[in-house]
Amino acid sequence: MDQILAIRPFVPAKDFDASKRFYRALGFTLTHEDESIAILKLGSFSFILQNFYVKEFAENCMIQLLVRDVDSWWQKTKPGQLVEQFSVGAPREPALQSWGMKVGFIFDPSGVLWHVAEVPF
């Protein structure tokens, strides 16, 4: 059996340049860029931002980012400061959810919802 090295979602971007700036402000590093895609990396994980947008897809796209301490990550990253700069929806601070995980929520400029969750183990 082949060893699986990663799963990288393709994330839509309504405004490709604004989305790249948004993710860099969140701490992602841009590792590749051309006119149709950008690869953004955080730690050892990455995703592919695509210069492609369909409203219904973007607004139903969700990604979960798992961290060891969500409160510490939230305090360090300060996602609330991105609202005015990028005209994104207000983030929801971390709180214990009904499914048992502590999660904060962040919207990107295209409406993609990120669940920033504390690792439960």
Model-derived regions: residue spans:
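Core segments of cupin and vicinal oxygen chelate
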Residues: 10-47, 53
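Short, charged/polar, Gly/Pro-enriched secondary-structure boundary elements
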Residues: 46-48, 55-57, 111-112
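Conserved beta-strand in the GNAT
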Residues: 48-50, 105, 115-117
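Vicinal oxygen chelate
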Residues: 63-113
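Short acidic/glycine-enriched loop/turn segments that link adjacent beta-strands
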Residues: 34-36, 57, 98-102
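N-terminal beta-strand motif that seeds the catalytic metal site of vicinal oxygen chelate
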Residues: 1-17, 63, 120-121
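Acetyl-CoA-dependent GNAT
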Residues: 52-53, 91, 96-97, 118-121
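Active-site beta-strand termini and strand-to-loop segments that position acidic
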Residues: 40-44, 106-109, 119
